[in-house]
Amino acid sequence: MLVLISDLHLGDGTTGSSIPTSAFQLFAKRLRLDAHFASAQGERYRPIEELDVILLGDILEVLHSNRWLYAVGDETRARMTRPGESDYIRPWSDPTDPKYAAKLLEVTRAILEANKDSFEIMRKLASGEAIEFDAPDEHGNRDRNSDKKIPLKVRFHYMVGNHDWYYYLKGGSFDVIRREIIQALGLSNLPEPFPFDLRKMDKNFPWEEDSAPAIRKLFEEYRVFARHGDLHDKFNFNRERGRGYPTLGDLLGVEVINKYPEVLKTMPGIDPLFAQNPSESADVRPGFAAPLYVKAQLH
């Protein structure tokens, strides 16, 4: 059984609210029901042995965190960093700068903490604690009275999109971050760069296909193919260089959508409630419609 999910945008709470834990509880319930339904097709009862969930990008909302506006470790958020300053770091900065991985780790840990109850549900699904089947009897029928249960471990596979492409970056410092994500979400990924594209749409594209053999095997087995849709968005994907590079969308997200509410908070005479409302513009899709949302708030 294969399930694909994308665009959960689970953030650290600094620019908007994430979907509640109750949504994950409902997801686990639906997944359990579907697994049981798939195990009892026709007159035969055969508990399924595999259930894979592909997280198809923009699962963790890394881009829309106002932590990018401040120095690494600055929890006071009293002063935004500026270009040219020694503590300045943004998604489009040089990823080999030690501050880059440090800031990404800071943002990632904040996201994992803010959504820890939701991720606990994922871990229980992955460990086999959330879905189990009645064992079949000697005739292959479902034995509802049997004390023996067959647990099903859900395998979660992470692929990146344009709001979490930072987990595609190579290097030991980024492997450390990915390990924390794997542990927190119960992923089946290795700590190497999370994949983006397993089949180039155009052979002339300059980047290489990602390997990800486990995901590739699923695509072949189920005769499907999937990638995040940013490949078709020129503002959020660089077709000349590939997924491991920043785009105009990163700049808009940090310096406009994230920054505007933070600037309002520092202006005298601004109602704190009004200053908070524009932070929800991070949830506006597409991102370029955010100014329309802000204009509506002004009225």
Pin down the residues of each PLM region:
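Extended recognition/assembly regions associated with phosphoester-bond processing machinery
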Residues: M1-H299
